[in-house]
A protein has these predicted regions:
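Short, flexible active-site loop motifs that bind/organize anionic cofactors or intermediates
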Residues: 8, 56, 68, 80, ...
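Short, basic/glycine-rich phosphate-binding loops at helix/coil junctions
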Residues: 183-185, 222-223
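C-terminal substrate-binding subdomain of Rossmann-fold SDR/epimerase-dehydratase oxidoreductases
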Residues: 202-340
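Catalytic core of nucleotidyl cyclases, primarily class III adenylyl/guanylyl cyclases
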Residues: 187-189
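Glycosyltransferase donor-binding loop in the core domain
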Residues: 61, 85, 97, 197, ...
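Short-chain dehydrogenase/reductase
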Residues: 98, 147-155, 191, 195-199, ...
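N-terminal Rossmann-like NAD(P)+-binding domain of SDR-like oxidoreductases, especially those catalyzing
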Residues: 1-184
């Protein structure tokens, strides 16, 4: 088994991935600055996996902390989640995103190189694809100028890692292009708990259902889609976490840099998600239609054939499963990870 450094491991996707890593027998070190996460999530990770992990509170921009981690732990590979991810905020504060997501990633790989650690799984995004591409999106399609600055930072880091791998054959890098993670651990003890107003659909839906917010804001109902609302490929966070384990196992045995889409291959509109949530959970969700959000595209869903064929990965959970698990998490934890 390997020892894995997980940056951003206290966050939504990172924490679910830590459960998978620990349950598979790996040792885990988490580095997280807790800017959009809670240390309570890591306590629950260890309970659910019945195994301890090491936690370091700090930032990937801090070279000293990174060097200390690599000095004190015999790290075999890194899974890199740490970064800012709000599309709307990235349009308003681009420098903040460039520093955290691009400079932070450079800081991390420099520390990895100093420590002679060359195995990396990078948390990328389907937003790297040129918005002119027609879904289903596959990995051979051109990346292009993403429609928002968040996607731009992911694309730049992908390109940096590709060039790094081409220049130094010691590197083995997986670029996982996520579509839209939703759902929660089946125990109801882990889920998405954003700080402040949610930027993603599902925590907004569940917070309205549990009474924390009055209404859901749906951004745009004039897209050329089945009902005018945006269509996305929603994937269960447990399926996504398992994809990281599959990618890690693949990269531990191979060299080079390669991208994989991580999605179900099916698109659902925002209104379809809301109506399905109401049906599955017998809970009404009030909503308002708002103007389109800058940087959003009408339709985005994956061709996931490469990940299925090469990583031995297969998504297992349906949209109904995702929505049932999301609500199970929220109703058990109406205030998220806080105890009040």
């Amino acid at each position: 088994m390997a020892k894995i450094l997980v940056t951003g491991g206290a966050g939504y996707i990172g924490s679910h991935t830590c459960i998978q890593l620990l349950s598979a027998g790996h040792d885990v070190v988490v580095l997280d600055n807790l800017s959009n996460s809670s240390v309570e999530s890591l306590a629950r990770v260890q309970t659910l996996a019945a195994k301890k992990l090491d936690f370091v509170e700090g930032d990937i921009l801090d070279q000293q902390i990174l060097d200390q981690i690599f000095k004190h732990h015999s790290i075999d590979a890194v899974i890199h989640f740490a970064g800012l991810k709000a599309v709307g905020e990235s349009q308003k504060e681009p420098l903040k995103y460039f520093e955290n997501n691009i400079s932070g990633s450079i800081s991390l790989v420099k520390a990895m190189e100093r420590a002679q650690v060359f195995k990396l799984v990078f948390s990328s995004s389907a937003t790297v694809y040129d918005e002119a591409n027609i879904s289903p999106l596959n990995e051979t399609m051109p990346t292009g100028m993403p429609s928002n600055n968040y996607g731009y930072t992911k694309l730049i880091v992908e390109q940096l890692l590709e060039k790094l791998s081409a220049a130094d054959e010691r590197w083995s890098i997986a670029l996982l292009r996520y579509f839209n993670p939703v759902g929660a651990h089946q125990s109801g003890q882990m889920g998405e708990d954003p700080q402040g107003i949610p930027n993603n659909l599902m925590p907004y839906v569940t917070q309205v259902a549990v009474g924390r917010r009055d209404k859901l804001s749906i951004f745009g109902n004039d897209y050329e889609t089945v009902d005018g609302t945006g269509v996305r490929d929603y994937i269960h966070v447990v399926d996504l976490a398992n994809a990281h384990l599959c990618a890690l196992n693949h990269r531990l045995k191979t060299q080079g840099c390669r991208a994989w889409n991580i999605g179900t291959g099916q698109g659902s509109s925002v209104l379809e998600v809301v109506k399905t949530f109401e049906r599955v959970n017998q809970m009404p969700v009030a909503y308002n239609i708002e103007p389109r959000r800058e940087g959003d595209v009408a339709i985005s869903f994956a061709d996931n054939a490469r990940a299925i064929a090469e990583l031995g990965w297969q998504p297992k959970y349906s949209l109904e499963d995702m929505l049932a698990d999301s609500w199970n998490w929220q109703k058990q934890n109406p205030n998220g990870f806080t105890k009040d």
